[in-house]
Amino acid sequence: MACQSSYLHIDLSADLLVPDFGEKVIEINVASLKKLGILLSGRGSNFEAIAGSITSGRLRAEIAIVISNRADAPGLESARRRGLNAVLIPSKGRIREEHDSEVVAALKQAQVDLVCLAGYMRLLSADFVRAFSNQIVNIHPSLLPAFPGMDAQKQALEYGVKVTGCTVHFVDEHLDHGPIILQKTVPVLDGDDAHSLSARILAQEHIAYSEAIGLVLSGEVEVQDRKVVRKPARAEAK
């Protein structure tokens, strides 16, 4: 099953972690843009990074809907402040398949082209994954297949690796397992603890997620078995 991995609490006031959203807003034809659906359960820092990339023109896409399963998710309020279609679909006390069915219906109604998990702390059912085959992406704070699941940063420190990072991958029916789209490396320093390492990984996540989304939406890559590969260049017509 798919699951968005958890993160330690990071102080987003640090300059290192805040994406630069101060660039000039680029006006583009919204009708031609691919639509994103964002799922989040918490503060949604990767959602903020994606939204900032769109505002600055670095990512050509439109956020069609932001869905949270938690009413107290700061990311949901952030989406409302941005004037986005922010939807609460509570999950507490509900059967997973029933809740997923409602989320899928909302995503379908919004006509999204790609579903992005941004701190969505729910396991996705097999029906959900099948409804958006190779159209759901997740970001995980390790170089998969190393250190899947919870507390990936702590796992990396305890194992003693010298390099870790983050991975953007398609979601399949297994945890942190789908085909890898893009990875970025982060060195593990001698004085690192889980918080300092998490902070540096998160800074790279903010870059990597938008890059990977742009790559997928460009149509230049495809999934072959477990591999995400670039499509062959078309021969020019004579």
Which ranges hold each PLM region?
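One-carbon transfer enzymes
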Residues: 3-238
